[in-house]
Amino acid sequence: MKKYDRGWASLETGAALLIVMLLIAWGAGIWQDYIQTKGWQTEARLVSNWTSAARSYIGKNYTTLQGSSTTTTPAVITTTMLKNTGFLSSGFTETNSEGQRLQAYVVRNAQNPELLQAMVVSSGGTPYPVKALIQMAKDITTGLGGYIQDGKTATGALRSWSVALSNYGAKSGNGHIAVLLSTDELSGAAEDTDRLYRFQVNGRPDLNKMHTAIDMGSNNLNNVGAVNAQTGNFSGNVNGVNGTFSGQVKGNSGNFDVNVTAGGDIRSNNGWLITRNSKGWLNETHGGGFYMSDGSWVRSVNNKGIYTGGQVKGGTVRADGRLYTGEYLQLERTAVAGASCSPNGLVGRDNTGAILSCQSGTWKSSSASIWTNIKTFTLYPKNTQVLGRFKLCINTYRIDGREMAETEVVPIDMPDSNGEMIWQAKNYTQYSSYFMKITCLK
C-alpha cells in the first residue's frame, strides 16, 4: 500500500469501532429496559395477588367491615391480617422490592352506605419512577390499577380515573401504587362467598364449596364422577356395578343379580342362609360343601366325607357300604333272649352284654362257635416267629419256673371281620431243651 493511503485505512477502522461501540451501548440500554420491565411486571402480579386476597377477605367479612367503617373512616386491612386468615400464604413478604407496604382502605359508599368500596395503596419505602408506575398500573389484573404522583390523588392507568386519597382515609406519597376496588367489585366478592361456582377458580376452593344442605326438589344428579359422603339415606333403589365399603353396610334387604364376595365372615344374627335351585354352601378351595337337590336329603358336594371329633346324631344312620369303627360298637338298649323282634338280622345285647341276634322273629343268643383248622408250631430258644392269622394261639408245652416268663405268644394287630388276628411267638430261654409247642386255632 502506498504511504499516502494509510490515513484512510486508519479512519475506516476507527469508524467501524465507533459504530460497534454505539450498537453495544444501544443494546445494553434495551436489555436494561427489558429487565426493568420484567421486574415491574412481576411487581404488578404481586400487587394483583395481594389485591385479590384483600377482595376475598372483604367478601368473606362484608358484614363485619360494614359495621367497622363509615363513609369517611376506613377499616384498614394489612398483610398480616391476610396471612393470619389464610388469604395470603405465610411466606408472603410484608413489603415489595422497593420497601413499600400495601394496605387496603375500606369505606362505605357515600351514595349508598349499604355498599362498600376500597382502595389498595402502597406507602413508605422508595418511590417508583413514573415510567414504572405507568407500566405497573396497566399490568395490574385485579381491580383498577393506578398510581400516585402528587401524594394526594390516585390516578388510573391511561388516566382512566382519578380519586382523592382522602375519600378513602388513605395516606401515601409520590411514586406509589394504588388499586381501586369499586362497589360492584366488592359486591361480587360478597356474592362469591354465597355462590356455588360451576367451574374451578384457581386459589379459591371456597367458591366450589357448599355451606348448607341442598334440596334438589326431586331432580337428578347426573354424570357424577365420584360421590364422597359420611352417610347416605335412600328411600328407593341404589344401582351400581361395584362397591367398596371400609365399614358396615346396613339395610332391610339386599338383592344381587350375580355374586357377593366377602374378604371376611358373613354373619346372620337371627336369620337363615337361604339358597335356591339345588344350590347350597360350597368351599371353593377344596370342592366340598352341602346342598339339596330334592325334598328329603341334605347332600355332600362331590360326595365328600364328613369329619368331626364330636358326635353325629340322627333318628337312623344308614351306611350303603361297610360300617367301620376305630374303637368299639356300643349297644345301649338291651334285649331279652326269646322275646319277639323284627326284622330278622337285628343285632342286640342282653343285660350281661352277651350278643343277641333276631332270628325268625325271636331274639336268640349267639351259639358258641367251633374252632377248627388247628395248626401247631415248634419254636426253639432265642427265636421269634410270626405265626399267621388265627383267632387264638397258645403255648401248649410246659416250661417250668423262670423260663415260662421268658416266652410270649401275643397278637400284633386288631381283629378282622372274622375275629382273626396276626399272632407272634418269642422264645428267650437259654437252653435248647426248652422249646415251645404252640397251637393256633381258627
From Swiss-Prot:
Lineage: superkingdom? Bacteria
Which Pfam families does the entry link to? Shufflon_N (PF04917)
Q: Where is this region: Constant region?
A: 1-361
Which InterPro entries does its entry note? Enolase-like_N, Shufflon_N
Sorted UniProt keywords? Plasmid
Q: What residue spans carry the region label Variable region? A: 362-442
Miscellaneous field: This protein is expressed by a shufflon (= clustered inversion region that works as a biological switch). The orfs of this region share a constant N-terminus, while the C-terminus is variable.
Name under which the protein is recorded:
Shufflon protein B
